[in-house]
């Protein structure tokens, strides 16, 4: 699964830590998602989409 988390985070000028705090996960979880090493739960994907104001399928795509 590929994602645009790093890009969306840069557009909003958020650090990994700031994003992690907003969605209530660790900074390491955000790093793992950005690196493609971790696929987030549905709940986490929805929280991330809410932070960025985008649809889940605009942020996460199957390869």
Where are these regions (language model features)?
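DNA major-groove recognition helix of helix-turn-helix/homeodomain DNA-binding modules
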Residues: 43-58
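Residues in the helix-turn-helix
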Residues: 18, 29, 58
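Recognition helix of helix-turn-helix/homeodomain-like DNA-binding domains
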Residues: 25-38
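Short basic helix-loop element that most often maps to the first helix and adjoining turn
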Residues: 3-22
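Short amphipathic recognition helices of helix-turn-helix/homeodomain-type DNA-binding modules
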Residues: 60-63
